[in-house]
Swiss-Prot record:
Terminates signal transduction at the neuromuscular junction by rapid hydrolysis of the acetylcholine released into the synaptic cleft. This is Acetylcholinesterase. The active site is at 227 (acyl-ester intermediate), 520 (charge relay system), 633 (charge relay system). The gene is ACHE. Disulfide bonds join 94-121, 281-292, 595-713. The keyword Glycosyltransferase does not apply. Pfam families: AChE_tetra, COesterase.
Amino acid sequence: MAPLFLLLLLLLSPSPTSAHRFAYSAPNRPEVRTTTGSVRGLLIPAGPSGSTAAAFLGIPFAVPPLGPLRFRPPLPIPTPWTGIRDADSQPFACYQMVDTTFPGFQGSEMWNPNREMSEDCLYLNVWTQKGDPTEPPVLVWIYGGGFTGGSVSLDVYDGRYLAAAEEAVVVSMNYRVGSLGFLALAGHRDAPGNVGLWDQRLALQWVRDNAEAFGGDPDLITLFGESAGAASVGFHLLSPHSKGLFRRAVLQSGSPNGPWATIGAAEGRRRAAALGRAVGCPYGNETEFLGCLRGKEAADVLEGEGVVMPPQSVFRFAFVPVVDGDFVVDSPDVALWGDYGVKGGEGGHGVEGGDGGYGVKGGDGVKGGYGGGYGARGVREGDGDGGYGVKEGLREGYGVKEGYGVEGDGANAYGARVPPRPHRDETPPDAYGAKGSADAYGAKAAPRPHRDETSPDAYGAKMPPRPHRDEASPDTYGAKMPPRPHRDETSPDAYGAKMPPRPHRAGGEVEVLLGAVRVEGSYFLVYGVPGFGKDNESLISREEFLGGVRMGVPQATELAAEAVVLHYTDWLDADNPVKNREALDDIVGDHNVVCPLMAFAQRWAQRGGKVYAYLFDHRSSTLLWPSWMGVPHGYEIEFVFGLPLEPRNNYTREEVELSRRIMRYWGNFARTGDPNGGVGGPRWPPYTPSGQRYAHLNARPLSVGHGLRTQICAFWTRFLPKLLNATGPPEDAEREWRLEFHRWSSYMGRWRTQFEHYSRQQPCATL
């Protein structure tokens, strides 16, 4: 009888994740023990019907990045603190520029920090239901702000309503922004760049380690973010450093392959030097340069950021993630479209049977071997004709028909067989990849993979690292390839080049939900584009429209700008000021958000990933911006976080129900990978490469659309790259052709020498 009694007692006893998982040393003050120490939160109301949530605010997840730690990746807290730390107030915001364009206007000031700013800002917030007996999903929010601003303390990011409504654990973390988060001297240990992304990654690791302590399931972590936060989510999807830390991802109005979201390593150095000049720290010896910058007050460093970017641009930011060969292994478009060693994958820019984006129509890709990004065992000859495709020859940016990973651009728009292009400095990219650069759509010059800047070839050219291969991977002739050394960040290859880690495979492992709002561009136009303003109808003259195109597509060539004008003009009514305004809305939104995002969706789905897409097209009744701006960038967030559930916010009844429905979609997706369930009405279908279906999210019952901006996005992803490839300066093309041919010959010669040395040591039976 005693064993049965003990068994019943065990079954009925509360578990650590039951309604009594929190300890209470005082009323309404729940306590949780984490891996870094114990914290004491508070119970707070969470909407109508007496709902409550437990909030733990301002939990540190890293050593404060002060003094010599400025510009460095974050350090985890080395030992747990003693005693119980109060987690009942919002943390400091990270240092950032404050928007003063419209003083006193809440529509813009709602995005400014509402807490004191400090470099001691690496804290996170956790909201969870008071007594949920299950292990709910964990939703981890990454805020947007162009990598220049943002804070977890903003009212619009209050996670209590979402946590209570969806019985979820909701987390948000601060990360460093601006130059303090993204100043980049790639390869320098004291300022490698992307430390803001490393902040996010360390917070994500902390969440995974402590999810159970808050009642969450560490195997059901979903990353979600908006704008730069969505781009950050995408970087984690593609980075090998974040693999395994989360299960699902939501990208709201942003993606890592947007033309504003990354720069190259050389451009990162140029911007760092420009900042140094502005604050009195001349660029030279990089260690001394960084020492000078660390000696400046944070506010002075931020003020210097204003001179880094030209003022005549829209949707561009001074300090953003850099392709460092480590966290951001390669440019996002290459990481998405390249295969990076997965056998049988499609080629980097050739998609079997699909339209895709990035200037490829029905390409075959790479057959077997190493797959896309860096060339392979052989490229099937076919009739692909994309901006990077070549008919019967070089099929993609980094591939060759025979050989091993020759670096170059492939061919021109007409499929001519050409040798790879020469080394290009990653100078400021123009909007479509004009000479010396690349953009998110891969126009004219694709960004090169990370390379050690100290490894010259025989002609003095800096060589890229060779791609990964295993010992069983045959080369073009069937010979097994010599094994590569261990791939860590310090292991040289045969030529002394340091090898970047291989990126997380793009697609097939993480379910993705993504989408945009109806008018993505209007919010940015009021910040300096002539003719636009929040207090007028922004009726745009033809002259203002033409000037706005140059600002909306920064650094575009004359021909590219003319193509944009041609495509977005209603030539039956070219001087109509309303149509000119709406066209600029569309140009900025399509170029920066919608088309990159849908290209991301297309590729993720083509690689086997499960994707759901949406268009949010409800204009909030509380929106303070003028009606001509429509449903602007960022104004779905309040519905995702459940702010309409708070009666004091004065939303309509229909908006309360819309918010409940959207929270249910997000919660369902976090739990199961499918937004459907418990909502009623039509089902939200998955996005597929052929159907391209997406859901309209508004106050009406769900409806389904097909091909979100598909036709217009073909202009950005197909036509313009071909146009730029076909019209480069002939004298430059000839010079580049000759130079790169010699580099290519030298590279292949050294590869053959290494292979012959290996084959003498270990004869290859398959030769």
